[in-house]
Amino acid sequence: MNGQNIRIRLKAFDHRILDASTREIVATAKRTGAQVRGPIPLPTRIEKFTVNRSPHIDKKSREQFEMRTHKRLLDIVDPTPQTVDALMKLDLAAGVDVEIKL
């Protein structure tokens, strides 16, 4: 795998499990002899929802909810075949979305 990079994008609603998964990926890649760039924190997407508190009247009384999507970016430079095997076998937390590009 000469001259090839693996780009990993991680997304989660909880930043603590996202950071734990990132640390796990970095440790696995370094243990197998690959060079890691990152983790690079990407902008957090904040999605806000405004709803009426009352089911019937009183438009002035509202409540806001928000959903934050935290993102991280990792680049693994010149991965070895052992690195790819170790990353495929890695078991991450349930709330983390992993997107891998070669």
From Swiss-Prot:
The keyword Nucleus does not apply. GO terms for biological process: translation. One of its GO terms (molecular function) is tRNA binding. Pfam families: Ribosomal_S10. GO terms for cellular component: ribonucleoprotein complex; ribosome. It comes from the Bacteria. Belongs to the universal ribosomal protein uS10 family. HAMAP family: Ribosomal_uS10. Part of the 30S ribosomal subunit. This is Small ribosomal subunit protein uS10. It comes from Xanthobacter autotrophicus (strain ATCC BAA-1158 / Py2). The lineage of its organism: Bacteria, Pseudomonadati, Pseudomonadota, Alphaproteobacteria, Hyphomicrobiales. The gene is rpsJ.
